[in-house]
Amino acid sequence: MSVVVRHDWDHKELQALFDLPFPELLHRAASVHRAHFDPAEVQVSTLLSVKTGGCPEDCAYCPQAQRYDTGVTAQKLLETEEVVAKARQAKAAGASRFCMGAAWRSPKERDIPKVAAMIREVKAMGLETCATLGMLDAGQARALKDAGLDYYNHNLDTAPDYYDTIIHTRQYQDRLNTLEHVRDVGLKTCCGGIVGMGETRDHRIGLLLALATLPAHPDSVPINQLVQVPGTPLHGTQQLDPFEFVRMIAVARIAMPKSMVRLSAGREAMSDELQALCFLAGANSIFYGEKLLTTGNPDTERDQTLFQRLGLRPMQITVDAAEHDHPATVHAEITRSAACEHTA
């Protein structure tokens, strides 16, 4: 099956996919998935909060916002040795990528060398590295790239026309600017959003449209289901229909055929059957480990058992400490095309 990677999707096209009968949508998504990936392989990442709590933002879903009474207390940045120990445990458990998250609006200049040291140590272990630190300027993105960072996560969170319902302290354009800085230095992007925040299907389509029309599709697209934390404004929001969540995965797979589509937050509350449908619909990445920043996640034993029951296996990724010229990613294709145009 030949699948063209497009950046010119429109709202009506994505709506038509969402509106397909459920079996037909899953069939199309599974066919696209098989054209680009081994359907039995799932990329496994582990996420560690290296700086928890005290964030000045007002994201309505987030227990780390200091303005909400959620029981999360602000903590200092972890020492590099602590991070390396956690990375070693993650690798032993089967993770191929180690993600480091900090509850900052944006990192201060004094923070960058400390995070860079973490990146270098984790990368030297043979793990892919990812960081999510808030907004970056061009110089900070370059410093992280020079330290050996592979991926930078910065989510769009929701559709542009629903964004102001969820967040007031950061503009949508701020997020797009950070993604541009990250792409410009050659970092791979991890960018997705959250569903189940009271949005409509039209808003979910808007989120996928924003992602699928970026200059380069994100290399990883995390689809988070809202974890409702007492004390946050979104606690008590009506739960999303599980089949609607699967539709979100399926349309993401069709619209961004070469991206990793990740089951992210909210997986702890998902049944094994729901997760199996998501894998069938094109999800091929998960966060592995018992905690995602401050919220729960299935324990590794449950995930290993689920993989065995479904005949799935962790994706094997070889990482060299030295940088490759053109890693096999969506962004690399954009980079190559730009280089060819520049030299033509």
UniProtKB/Swiss-Prot annotation:
Enzyme type, top EC level: transferase
Subunit organization: Homodimer.
Reactions catalysed according to its record: (4R,5S)-dethiobiotin + (sulfur carrier)-SH + 2 reduced [2Fe-2S]-[ferredoxin] + 2 S-adenosyl-L-methionine = (sulfur carrier)-H + biotin + 2 5'-deoxyadenosine + 2 L-methionine + 2 oxidized [2Fe-2S]-[ferredoxin]
Keyword Transferase attached: yes
Pathway the protein takes part in: Cofactor biosynthesis; biotin biosynthesis; biotin from 7,8-diaminononanoate: step 2/2
Residues reported to bind [2Fe-2S] cluster: 99, 130, 190, 262
Domain of life: Bacteria
Cofactor binding remark: Binds 1 [4Fe-4S] cluster. The cluster is coordinated with 3 cysteines and an exchangeable S-adenosyl-L-methionine. Binds 1 [2Fe-2S] cluster. The cluster is coordinated with 3 cysteines and 1 arginine.
Gene label: bioB
Chain residues that bind [4Fe-4S] cluster: 55, 59, 62
Family assignment from sequence similarity: Belongs to the radical SAM superfamily. Biotin synthase family.
Gene3D superfamilies the record matches: Aldolase class I (3.20.20.70)
Molecular-function GO term, any one: 4 iron, 4 sulfur cluster binding
Cofactor entry: [4Fe-4S] cluster; [2Fe-2S] cluster
BP GO annotations: biotin biosynthetic process
Keyword annotations: 2Fe-2S, 4Fe-4S, Biotin biosynthesis, Iron, Iron-sulfur, Metal-binding, S-adenosyl-L-methionine, Transferase
Tagged with keyword tRNA processing: no
EC number: 2.8.1.6
Residue span(s) of domain Radical SAM core: 40-267
Organism in which the protein naturally occurs: Xanthomonas oryzae pv. oryzae (strain KACC10331 / KXO85)
Name by which UniProt lists this protein: Biotin synthase
Main function: Catalyzes the conversion of dethiobiotin (DTB) to biotin by the insertion of a sulfur atom into dethiobiotin via a radical-based mechanism.
